[in-house]
Amino acid sequence: MDPLDGTQEFIARSGDFATIIALVENNHPVMGVVYGPVSGVTYYAYAGKGAWKIPDMAQSLKIQTHKHELPSSSIAIAISRRQDINKITRRLSSAWNYDLVPLGSAALKACLVAEGAVDCYLRLGPTGEWDTAATQCIVEEAGGRILSTQLSPLSYNERETLENPNFIVLGDADLPWNEILKIKD
């Protein structure tokens, strides 16, 4: 549980913060809920049951990631408002066009991938397992993936530390992410 994901955004009064709850079984998230109190939007998923969005007390809407027709004209990438943009752009191949979408909360950025509003969220910097467990369930149930930047799945309660490695949230796994994000094998 993370009662305040996006603490700096909360302090700055940007509205880009969330409350996160996850259930992890056998080192893998099986349930996730993300609530944005300012927008009133809730995202949730349960393993095998799909991913859903409740926009401001309305009816639940099933969500899914965006799939591209190749060649794609542009890749939308959610980025942190607080991160050095050059650190991100150095990782991007010049062969593609990008729309960078700044946002605060890590959970809300991952949920944008889950609902197909952006294609990717690249996180280079410290986060805890509590920042990704709920959104991993939501993203996976929506058809996406959350992987380390070495392209291995994130795991929970298996390391000596609860800190995550750098990671990427991918909507369309069929895109050539090794090329797009200049990932070295």
Please place each PLM-identified region on the residue numbering.
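DPxDG-like acidic metal-binding loop motif
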Residues: M1-W52
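Residue-level signal for inorganic ion chemistry
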Residues: T7, G36, A45, I77, ...
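Short secondary-structure boundary/capping segments
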Residues: V34, H66-E69, L92, E158-E160
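Short Pro/Gly-enriched coil loops immediately N-terminal to beta-strands
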Residues: Y35, A45-Y46, L70-P71, T161-P165
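Short helix-loop capping/hinge motifs at secondary-structure junctions, enriched
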Residues: G50-K53, A58-S60, D174-E179
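Short loop->beta-strand "edge-of-pocket" segments that line small-molecule binding or catalytic clefts
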Residues: H66-K87, S94-G104
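Oxyanion/phosphate-interacting regions
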Residues: R90-S94, K109-D185
